Amino acid sequence: MSFGHGRLQTETPFAAIINGRIIGIAYIRKSDYYPLPEIYPWVSGIFVTESYRGHRISEKLISFANEYAKEKGFDKTYIPSVHTGLYEKYGYRYLGDIVNYANETDRLYVKEI
């Protein structure tokens, strides 16, 4: 498995690739689906193909994204989610509830990197 990233001005995508197939993705974004311009960078868009779930791919993608953010001079990252208990195992702590542009409530997590 290999991990790669592309460079964009407002977001940087990361992909987990096996045998030339993308099996997982994550992004570092300057902004996300929330009216919170003072909070960034976001680790978001985390997805792993169902057949590869349970193999710690998302953990590796998040770690890779955090290392990239750290190299860029950031000391923390944020993850928005509806899940409870998922990102805590990756070192994130619950910061509070946030409301997205669709007026839906999500949980905001932060991690010192």
Predicted segments, located by residue:
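Conserved acetyl-CoA-binding loop-helix of GNAT-fold acetyltransferases
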Residues: 45-48, 54-67, 79
